């Protein structure tokens, strides 16, 4: 049975890092899905931007972040699962794996879509937290209109909580990753 791990957290809390560490341990039995990929692909196509730079982690993406958030919220207002669906369709057309790691869940409706589409028994929620000083050391600076909008704050008050919460303030060794996989009930051996 396919398991889907929905990874969420604030900017610069290590969502990509943890996703990549989990995938490395799970190997070819897993793939990383990014809900932001279809957002960035459509935005780049629409404005004729450099998609590779937009997919990266540098200042180019930050320059367009606020406008992408506004536009993607408009799309979600019409179809809350649109970007989740497109990201999953693209990923599953490339590779079928027992474990899907969705590295950038940001909204309650993202979680809702995955639970409705695949069933709650297949969906595991992982919330990453990091202290503000840790995030700052990773390059985060509070930005009004980005850090105080639903794309960053919607999951702060998730009513039914998360299946697993992980403080990600230090580099995790392999044992910590294995413990996390056990807590997520994912077979890695």
From Swiss-Prot:
Keywords: ATP-binding, Cholesterol biosynthesis, Cholesterol metabolism, Cytoplasm, Kinase, Lipid biosynthesis, Lipid metabolism, Nucleotide-binding, Steroid biosynthesis, Steroid metabolism, Sterol biosynthesis, Sterol metabolism, Transferase. Transmembrane segments: none annotated. GO terms for cellular component: cytosol; peroxisome. Pfam families: P-mevalo_kinase. InterPro entries: P-loop_NTPase (IPR027417), Pmev_kin_anim (IPR005919). Its EC number is 2.7.4.2. This is Phosphomevalonate kinase. It comes from Drosophila melanogaster. The gene is Pmvk.
